[in-house]
UniProtKB/Swiss-Prot annotation:
SMART domains: Asparaginase (SM00870). This is L-asparaginase. It comes from Wolinella succinogenes (strain ATCC 29543 / DSM 1740 / CCUG 13145 / JCM 31913 / LMG 7466 / NCTC 11488 / FDC 602W) (Vibrio succinogenes). GO terms for cellular component: cytoplasm. Substrate binds at residues 93-94. GO terms for molecular function: asparaginase activity. Homotetramer. The keyword Protein biosynthesis does not apply.
Amino acid sequence: MAKPQVTILATGGTIAGSGESSVKSSYSAGAVTVDKLLAAVPAINDLATIKGEQISSIGSQEMTGKVWLKLAKRVNELLAQKETEAVIITHGTDTMEETAFFLNLTVKSQKPVVLVGAMRSGSSMSADGPMNLYNAVNVAINKASTNKGVVIVMNDEIHAAREATKLNTTAVNAFASPNTGKIGTVYYGKVEYFTQSVRPHTLASEFDISKIEELPRVDILYAHPDDTDVLVNAALQAGAKGIIHAGMGNGNPFPLTQNALEKAAKSGVVVARSSRVGSGSTTQEAEVDDKKLGFVATESLNPQKARVLLMLALTKTSDREAIQKIFSTY
């Protein structure tokens, strides 16, 4: 029986990192090429026919919208090929959740797409990357992974792209899905799903980036006591088409900042309220009258994922009500 064909797209990150010492935390992200990365985990060749491609060699703090577009278009090209059964993306963990969510909304296939990374570089004494990659291949070739949307595989857990977020700066169990929990586990290659994301994704998503070369500028502004209008005005002057306001509590702005955001909304910039709190939803019509002020509530998306969705929404419309519907849907 022929083995499934899987393409691994490498973007860099800690999983491709290398340092001078196995017992020190310093390293260079993206220093290891995809060929060397795959050669370090020979057991994956028993599972599938593996092909590797280098998309970028960066730490994920260097991720850009242009790389997202390049990545999404390449994933769509690969999955349109009959012989390609799944795609895995090796990625730094800093912005993995944003890349995963972007792909969740722009990939046009039911075939599995898995993002995987590491919290310790390959030169570390207890590197987590090799097992994470081995598990990612097992998830990718498992039939139950079909039509699950894009997933993240880290630390023996499977997380839906929409829900996953990085909650710890250094621990190997850095990822969680605070509002919903993980959707499955993978233990030494044994895959088990408990549930799946219920929000539209991949083929059910309305977003088409096939002809898009650049995404609209959207800035995130972080709320705090004694906040001002300075950052709002700076975002407008920089040409932002949208602003994500990471508000206090249920997405609440400081009064002076709220006045500036209201003016921005009236000028045609889309202002979306999110929260700096780590879980829960930013609800419509609570302390802030969104309809009156012209704001959008991002519901259960954190600020960084709300930015991704707003960037895509702005490729279709700048109408407040239409964008609110998009946030309520995705």
